[in-house]
Amino acid sequence: MGSSQSTPKVQDANADAERIRKAQHSMAAAGGGSQCPLTPEQRAAASGENCGAGGACPVGADKASINPLNNELEHPNQKPAPDQPFALPTKREKSTIPKAGTETETWTYPSPQMFWNAMLKKGWRWQDDSLSKSDMENIISIHNANNEEAWREVLKWENLLHPECAEPKLKSFKGDAKNLSPRARFRNLFLGYDLPFDRHDWIVDRCGTKQVQYVIDYYDGGAVDPSSKLFTILDVRPAVNDIGNIWDRMVVAYWRFKFETLGFTPSLPIPPTEGHNVNH
């Protein structure tokens, strides 16, 4: 009979995966995302400096140098921080997410170096997470994969409920881990769900006819895949800040009850993802 004990290689892979999960939680708690956070007062005091070598965002950055769509410097800091323990790539990858206001352009992800610098600025302490260069690159891969998955979930809502717009595009986004959504609070208080460890808000341009806010809650799915390091479960849905969004969510809730609870057929042509895979 085979041994039930895991091999050292498997144990190392599991340890790497757990370390990466812990780091992602602490990064989200520090602010999440890759933006340089600036207060209105700091923006008003603009003086044209760039982010320093340590990843600090300028107290007086030129207003024109800040992209209001992602609160990121137009020429972001790619220099290593003074106490950085290893070099990180500065190459940025293109996403598949179409960018509003352009014909064919897509959003570009931050490089590992940009991500590191932004996290330091938000108060993250890399010493607490003992990350390696490989860990950091895996975190970037997970970050990008989560964004791609979130966009696919947005498209399920848009394609099902608003097929008149052939190509919705992402206009802007921000991370806001400390601002729990009403849905997340309700699930935690009354249904016993864990709280999400991160939250993002995306503004989607619906072919120029409307700008729609989507809320994305990031839940810890428990088991970490040792190969992909993925562990996040996404809850993607329109925000309840507009009568149209509320109606869309009511329609989807009705369809889910009709087809999934009562067992009516046919099922939804594109399964909506409100609460998709968030199992507790």
Curated annotation (Swiss-Prot):
Keywords of the record: Heme, Iron, Lyase, Membrane, Metal-binding, Mitochondrion, Mitochondrion inner membrane, Repeat
Catalytic activity: holo-[cytochrome c] = apo-[cytochrome c] + heme b
Subcellular location: Mitochondrion inner membrane
Region feature Disordered, mapped onto this chain: 1-95
EC numbers on record: 4.4.1.17
Major subcellular site: mitochondrion
GO molecular function: holocytochrome-c synthase activity; metal ion binding
UniProt repeat feature HRM, residue ranges: 35-40, 56-61
GO CC annotation terms, alphabetical: mitochondrial inner membrane; mitochondrion
Role noted for this protein: Probable lyase that catalyzes the covalent linking of the heme group to the cytochrome C apoprotein to produce the mature functional cytochrome.
Entry similarity comment: Belongs to the cytochrome c-type heme lyase family.
Name by which UniProt lists this protein: Probable holocytochrome-c-type synthase
Lineage, top ranks: Eukaryota, Metazoa, Ecdysozoa, Nematoda, Chromadorea
Gene name of the encoded protein: cchl-1
